[in-house]
């Protein structure tokens, strides 16, 4: 379960539409590093992410990506297997949108609380 509490320069950001959850694999880790400049945590303008080029951009891993609606700054993923994941959250404060990314780990079916 998670919530958006991101602010920059005194402006609070709200989530836009859905939150993506991508499994951490060697391919997705390299892709995330290229797109966001980190595999741990990032806040990058959406236009910058879209402008970056990734190797093998046509690789089809979409069947493994999960998506949930973000409502009132909150989101939740249930039934995740143990492992590493990348949360991808588009946010806006009325200006140019940003994309937040954070790495999370799930273990033993326990809930993980994440604040971005």
Regions found by a protein language model. Give the residues of each.
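Long luminal/extracellular ectodomains of secretory-pathway precursor proteins
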Residues: 1-116
């Amino acid at each position: 379960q998670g919530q958006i509490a991101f602010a920059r320069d005194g402006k609070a950001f709200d989530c836009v539409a859905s939150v993506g959850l991508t499994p951490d694999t060697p391919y997705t880790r390299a892709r995330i590093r290229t797109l966001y400049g980190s595999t741990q945590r990032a806040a990058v303008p959406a236009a910058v992410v879209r402008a970056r080029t990734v190797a093998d951009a046509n690789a089809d891993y979409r069947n493994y990506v999960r998506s949930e609606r973000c409502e009132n700054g909150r989101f939740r993923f249930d039934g995740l297997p143990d492992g590493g994941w990348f949360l991808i959250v588009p946010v806006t404060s009325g200006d140019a949108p940003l994309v937040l990314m954070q790495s999370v780990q799930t273990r033993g079916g326990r809930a993980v609380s994440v604040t971005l």
